[in-house]
């Protein structure tokens, strides 16, 4: 069987880099992109800011404590999306097998590329140069035979780096790889692994698949295979939008039922506006709630009828809210709503593609969508 050639391209501090490119006064200075308010959150931090411990999803208040000279720049999502589109047009010159993971990163399967270039590393080098010429921005690239290792490789020499993990070197590389760098290992999973004495790939490889499944559920299968350099997930070209959603962080935490219902109503109205603009049709409504301690939960409900009207969405949103325990000791910081489970023909084709994956790998893809938030 022919060895695959997978590239993972990840833009370096994308939002912050765009702002530094456009404003020379911001260059070489600690910059964070986000809303500069009492409830603001860092979307992206420049590398100068990261040296001070500033990172994405951190509150602006905490970021300023760590870096008093931090410069906050408002987020321009539509502008960043335009630049992202430019970058994806470059990808399309080399392959049609492109899987966007977010606005600033994507997988490319270049096993059979359009330009007939033999080495994936040469393609990655060309793409990096093309991105720099077209946008003035840098990207990091990881190359390997599977998505797991390609993504790990792209992080290995950031910023503006390139790293290849060859099949014959993969097991040695994984053996020394800290488990926190494994795809799917979050804080809670990391704590469990450390409690079990698992600190790197070599440690993980010593644990039986049965025991990993016993502790981590279906993810245990994934960790078992990753530790052995096995990742069969294909690069899937997403033709159809997966969901439409919106969320709001409140200026003050809320817990009174009346206040929460009012904010939920406003969130429903915003969601309806986005659905109308996008033309998206879905059957699953998901409620996202983030509490004052930054923990968050999601609750979902599906039905046969498409969700495009207030009379359909609002009652479902209220039902989902009833499943959430909030109080004065556990107030709500953020509410979000999204509609997914697309009804279009393209989405059904995509579902068929996904159905070829093993169940545990399909679950990983779904979980990764949540990790991005």
What residue spans do the PLM features occupy?
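Gly/Gly-Pro- and Ser/Thr-rich, intrinsically disordered tail segments characteristic of DNA damage-repair
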Residues: 1-215, 220-221, 345-347, 352-373
């Amino acid at each position: 069987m022919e060895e695959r050639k997978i590239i993972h391209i990840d833009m370096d501090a994308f939002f912050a880099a765009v702002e530094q490119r456009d404003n020379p006064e911001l260059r070489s200075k600690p910059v964070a992109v986000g809303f500069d308010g009492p409830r603001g959150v860092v979307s992206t931090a420049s590398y100068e800011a990261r040296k001070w411990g500033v990172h994405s999803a951190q509150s602006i208040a905490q970021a300023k404590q760590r870096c008093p000279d931090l410069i906050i720049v408002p987020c321009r999502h539509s502008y960043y999306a335009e630049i992202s589109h430019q970058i994806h047009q470059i990808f399309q010159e080399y392959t049609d097998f492109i899987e966007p993971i977010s606005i600033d990163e994507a997988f490319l399967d270049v096993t059979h590329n359009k330009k007939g270039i033999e080495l994936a590393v040469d393609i990655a080098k060309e793409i990096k140069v093309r991105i720099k010429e077209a946008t003035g921005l840098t990207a990091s690239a990881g190359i390997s035979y599977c998505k797991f290792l390609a993504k790990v490789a792209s992080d290995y020499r950031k910023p503006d780096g390139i790293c290849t993990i060859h099949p014959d070197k993969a097991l040695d590389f994984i053996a020394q790889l800290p488990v926190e760098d494994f795809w799917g290992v979050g804080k809670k999973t990391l704590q469990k692994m450390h409690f079990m004495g698992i600190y790197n790939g070599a440690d993980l490889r010593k644990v039986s698949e049965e025991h990993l499944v016993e502790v981590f559920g279906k993810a245990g299968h994934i960790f078992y295979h990753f530790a052995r350099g096995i990742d069969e997930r294909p690069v899937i070209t997403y033709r159809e939008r997966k969901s439409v959603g919106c969320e709001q962080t409140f200026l003050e935490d809320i817990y009174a039922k009346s206040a929460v219902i009012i904010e939920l109503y406003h969130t429903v109205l915003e969601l309806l506006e986005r659905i109308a603009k996008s033309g998206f049709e879905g059957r699953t409504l998901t409620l996202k709630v983030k509490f004052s301690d930054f923990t968050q939960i999601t609750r979902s409900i599906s039905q046969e009828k498409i969700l495009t009207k207030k009379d359909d969405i609002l009652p479902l949103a209220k039902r989902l809210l009833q499943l959430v325990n909030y109080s004065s000791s556990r107030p709500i910081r953020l509410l979000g709503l999204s509609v997914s489970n697309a009804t279009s023909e393209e989405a059904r084709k995509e579902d068929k593609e996904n159905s070829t994956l093993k169940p545990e790998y399909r679950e990983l893809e779904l979980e990764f969508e949540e990790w991005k938030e």
